[in-house]
């Protein structure tokens, strides 16, 4: 029998998940580190947007008994991490597969204390082969593939084609040109904006997009953070120029009242999934207005430079074996590679390469984006050129950003002041999570 258990966030998740331990462990008295086999039944944890993926799996594999537990999907949230700390202490209770709410979760899920996420290198070699190395690079930790990407979420350069056509503007090709045009548009069209600063992914759009070393993992216990690096300096100069010109919103893209600002967005770097999730489904921007081109390059550099926003990670438990592991791997393979989820239901470009064209064909048929051929080419290119110099760490840079930059700007402080606060807090946060920090900032 298939069952589905929807759990709320907070302490109730921890208690209920512990109660489910017997469903996934097969032996509640197993010592910590011992692999167990339930005989086939699996428990999977998913956030709300991934519930349809689990339901599609249930329909495709009715003979596999599965508990589906809905968890808190807050990026940067601590509920899941707290649950896992309890499981690690008890030596049982872990889900057999999980969609990590935050990509940074893979850092604690693979450290020597937890070691939850299984090494998939030899378990799913054919699946791994289907990914572009640039897409899967975030799952490679110390030479081992410890997760699978759900979707490729590279930043492309989005723009409102209707606005550009109406006003005769030419698209920028460099970051510096973007800042200059953003300031010009803010002056000539007050209220029009060219980006958002208030969400955690602003770090990826602008700092990762510049190569600023905020998340340079040296080892499990050492990180390199250098906000005085030229790549950080150019990013902050760019943001200062646009912010001072009134071209950037201090809101975040996920804010409940961001739709009004979103309707006034004329251009911005942003993830592939912005097209369906933000523009179409959340902000209700009419079809035929938005399109995308390739990511921007920095002046003096020949290649585009872009970040990555999300593109969630699937993990499989290292604590299981036998039929339980086999079924968990079947689940992981399905959610990563099966078109019944990745093409039919998912809003983002599949991380798994062989499905990308099918997803693009579906988007073309839907007819939402303007200049679809240009957008599709940008999506595919961007997925292969995301800057590799940002690792997932136990400290969450995006959370530090929203706790420092956002409140500083909304209280009227300058971006320079906000940046200083961010830098100090980031280094303290990294040290709090056990990293020795190499820094000249």
Annotate the PLM regions.
Residues 275-286, 299-403, 433-441:
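C-terminal lobe and pocket-closing loops
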Residues 155-159, 314-316:
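Short glycine- and hydrophobic/aromatic-rich loop-to-beta-strand nucleating segment
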Residues 53, 231-238, 322-335, 418:
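Short amphipathic alpha-helical coupling segments at ligand-binding clamshell hinges
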Residues 141-142, 146-150, 155, 179-225, ...:
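Extracytoplasmic/periplasmic solute-binding protein
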Residues 182, 222-251, 294-298:
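Glycine-centered hinge/linker elements that transmit conformational signals in sensory
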Residues 78-94, 110-112, 163-164, 183-187, ...:
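Short helices/loops that flank or line small-molecule/ion binding pockets
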Residues 2-107, 171, 323, 343, ...:
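Conserved N-terminal structural module of periplasmic/extracytoplasmic solute-binding proteins
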């Amino acid at each position: 029998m298939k069952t589905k258990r929807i759990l709320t966030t907070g302490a109730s998740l921890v208690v209920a998940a512990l109660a489910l331990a017997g469903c996934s462990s097969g032996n509640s008295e197993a010592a910590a580190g011992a692999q167990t086999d339930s005989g086939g039944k699996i428990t999977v944890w998913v956030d709300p947007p991934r519930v349809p993926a689990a339901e599609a799996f249930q329909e495709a594999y009715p003979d596999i008994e599965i508990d589906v537990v809905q968890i808190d999907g807050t990026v940067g949230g601590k509920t899941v991490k707290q649950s896992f700390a309890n499981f690690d202490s008890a030596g049982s209770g872990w889900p057999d597969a999980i969609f990590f709410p935050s990509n940074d979760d893979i850092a604690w899920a693979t450290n020597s204390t937890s070691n939850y996420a299984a090494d998939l290198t030899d378990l799913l070699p054919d699946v791994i082969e289907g990914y572009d190395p640039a897409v899967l690079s975030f799952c490679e930790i110390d030479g081992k593939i410890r997760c699978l990407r759900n979707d490729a979420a590279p930043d492309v350069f989005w723009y409102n084609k209707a606005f550009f056509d109406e006003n005769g503007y030419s698209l920028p090709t460099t970051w510096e040109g973007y800042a200059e045009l953003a300031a010009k548009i803010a002056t000539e069209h007050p209220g029009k904006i060219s980006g958002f600063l208030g969400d955690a992914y602003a770090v990826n759009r602008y700092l990762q997009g510049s190569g600023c070393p905020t998340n340079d993992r040296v080892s499990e216990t050492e990180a390199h953070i250098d906000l005085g690096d030229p790549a950080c300096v150019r990013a902050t100069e760019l943001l200062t120029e646009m912010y001072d010109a009134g071209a950037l919103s201090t809101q975040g893209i996920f804010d409940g009242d961001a739709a009004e600002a979103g309707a006034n967005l004329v251009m911005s770097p942003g993830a592939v999934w912005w097209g369906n999730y933000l523009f179409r489904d959340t902000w209700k921007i009419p079809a035929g207005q938005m399109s995308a081109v390739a990511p921007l390059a920095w002046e003096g550099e020949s290649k585009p430079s872009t970040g990555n926003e999300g593109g969630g990670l699937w993990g499989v438990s290292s604590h299981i074996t036998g039929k339980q592991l086999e079924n968990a791997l079947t689940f992981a393979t399905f959610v990563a590679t099966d078109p019944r989820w990745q093409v039919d239901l998912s809003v983002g470009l599949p991380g798994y390469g062989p499905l990308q064209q099918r997803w693009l064909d579906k988007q073309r048929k839907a007819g939402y984006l303007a200049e679809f051929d240009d957008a599709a080419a940008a999506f595919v290119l961007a997925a292969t050129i995301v800057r590799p110099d940002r690792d997932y760490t136990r400290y969450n840079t995006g959370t530090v950003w929203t706790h420092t930059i956002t409140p500083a700007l909304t209280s009227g402080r300058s971006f320079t002041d906000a940046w200083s606060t961010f830098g100090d807090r980031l280094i303290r946060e990294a040290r709090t999570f056990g990293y020795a920090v190499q820094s000249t900032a």
